């Protein structure tokens, strides 16, 4: 008999990025992993409105949004009663930004190039 097969439970994810093409790519990656993208947003305001309507379990949030800061949004999402698991993404992630991500309650911060990485999958799925 083979080893133990761990069934991954799909989670509902909100994708927040001002680049529609990136949101589309993220949606393809996440649904390919078996997750359900329950909403997309291009701004902080849209993300907060969407989050209260669809109550996602997790969110993939860009650091740079046109109407605000992804770190502040991450803090607000993580503080919601159902405690959204937030992973921040950035075109130019560095160590200082990664520390800031953890301080606001995010699971971590990854460069956008690592969208399809196992690290992102681990951060989103480990509730």
Task: Describe the predicted segments one by one.
Residues 43, 69-72:
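Acidic catalytic/metal-coordinating carboxylates
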Residues 71-82:
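Short amphipathic alpha-helix used as the core "switch/output" element in two-component signaling
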Residues 62, 90:
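Active-site residues of response regulator receiver
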Residues 1-12, 117-127:
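Non-catalytic signal-transmission and effector/linker regions of two-component phosphorelay proteins
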Residues 66:
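The feature encodes the CheY-like receiver
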Residues 20-39:
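Two-component/phosphorelay signaling modules centered on CheY-like receiver
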Residues 40-58:
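Acidic, metal-coordinating helix/loop segments flanking the phosphotransfer/catalytic sites
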Residues 72, 93-110, 114, 118-122:
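Alpha4 helix (beta4-alpha4-beta5 surface) of REC/receiver domains from two-component response regulators
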């Amino acid at each position: 008999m083979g080893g133990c097969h761990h069934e991954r439970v799909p989670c509902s994810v909100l994708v927040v990025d001002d680049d529609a093409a990136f949101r589309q790519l993220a949606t393809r990656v996440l649904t390919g992993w078996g997750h359900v993208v329950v909403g997309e947003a291009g701004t902080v305001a849209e993300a907060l409105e969407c989050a209260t309507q669809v109550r996602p379990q997790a969110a993939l949030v860009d650091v740079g949004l046109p109407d605000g800061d992804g770190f502040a949004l991450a803090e607000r999402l993580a503080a919601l009663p159902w405690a959204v698991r937030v992973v921040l993404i950035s075109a130019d992630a560095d160590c200082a930004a990664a520390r800031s991500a953890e301080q606001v309650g995010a699971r971590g911060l990854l460069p956008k190039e690592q969208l399809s990485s196992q690290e992102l999958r681990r951060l989103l799925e480990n509730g």
